[in-house]
């Protein structure tokens, strides 16, 4: 595919590495051939790079596959996922899921991204429901609006919650920033 066709979200292979386009811009000066500048994320390492191509240059388009998976459990080293269509189980090293592991509970439905049989990562739902396992006691008389206290949820994530949240309360947590979003119904 031509680099002129690169758009945000497009995946491509360049110098043996797998990238997804974050931003793209085209510039042309005078008689020179146009240049395409691309800010891209390396899908294997997570690093972000800026690549400048000469207009008309070619790159290989990468076909990324996204599958619905169910998180089963982790054994401390690997996380185990199950394909909900084929019931095939896949394991991913926990080191590749440092942020995501803070929100994974048994049975959680997620999306797994893979390329040519290689697992690149997982995508979590925007919000997850977790149970509070530890919470500081609310200070009597502390009625300041918006007052918060520390709490720990079932996955070990430390969060700040309103004073009315106690141990055993199910709360909704945003997976983008790890913050309290509300009380579960």
From Swiss-Prot:
GO terms for molecular function: translation elongation factor activity. The keyword Protein biosynthesis applies. SMART domains: EFP, Elong-fact-P_C. It comes from the Bacteria. The keyword Protein biosynthesis applies. InterPro entries: Elong-fact-P_C (IPR015365), NA-bd_OB-fold (IPR012340), Rib_uL2_dom2 (IPR014722), Transl_elong_fac_P/YeiP (IPR020599), Transl_elong_KOW-like (IPR013185), Transl_elong_P/YeiP_cen (IPR001059), Transl_elong_P/YeiP_CS (IPR013852), Transl_elongation_fac_P (IPR011768). PROSITE patterns: EFP (PS01275). Disulfide bonds: none annotated. It is found in: Cytoplasm. Keywords: Cytoplasm, Elongation factor, Protein biosynthesis. It holds the Pfam family Elong-fact-P_C. GO terms for biological process: peptide biosynthetic process. GO terms for cellular component: cytoplasm. Pathway: Protein biosynthesis; polypeptide chain elongation. HAMAP family: EF_P. Involved in peptide bond synthesis. Stimulates efficient translation and peptide-bond synthesis on native or reconstituted 70S ribosomes in vitro. Probably functions indirectly by altering the affinity of the ribosome for aminoacyl-tRNA, thus increasing their reactivity as acceptors for peptidyl transferase. Belongs to the elongation factor P family. This is Elongation factor P. The gene is efp.
């Amino acid at each position: 595919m031509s680099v002129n066709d690169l758009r945000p979200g497009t995946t491509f292979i360049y110098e043996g590495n797998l990238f997804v386009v974050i931003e793209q811009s085209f510039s042309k000066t005078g008689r020179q051939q146009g240049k395409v500048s691309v800010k891209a994320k390396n899908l294997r390492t997570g690093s972000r790079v800026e690549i400048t191509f000469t207009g008309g240059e070619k790159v290989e388009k990468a076909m990324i596959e996204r599958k619905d998976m169910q998180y089963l459990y982790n054994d401390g080293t690997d996380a185990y996922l199950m394909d909900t269509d084929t019931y095939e189980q896949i394991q991913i090293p926990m080191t590749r899921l440092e942020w995501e592991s803070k929100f994974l509970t048994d049975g959680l439905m997620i999306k797994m991204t893979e390329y040519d049989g290689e697992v690149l990562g997982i995508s979590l739902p925007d919000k997850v429901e977790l149970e509070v396992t530890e919470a500081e006691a609310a200070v009597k008389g502390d009625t300041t609006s918006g007052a918060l206290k520390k709490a720990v949820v079932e996955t070990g994530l430390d969060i700040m919650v309103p004073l009315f949240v106690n141990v055993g309360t199910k709360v909704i947590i945003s997976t983008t920033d790890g913050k309290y979003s509300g009380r579960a119904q």
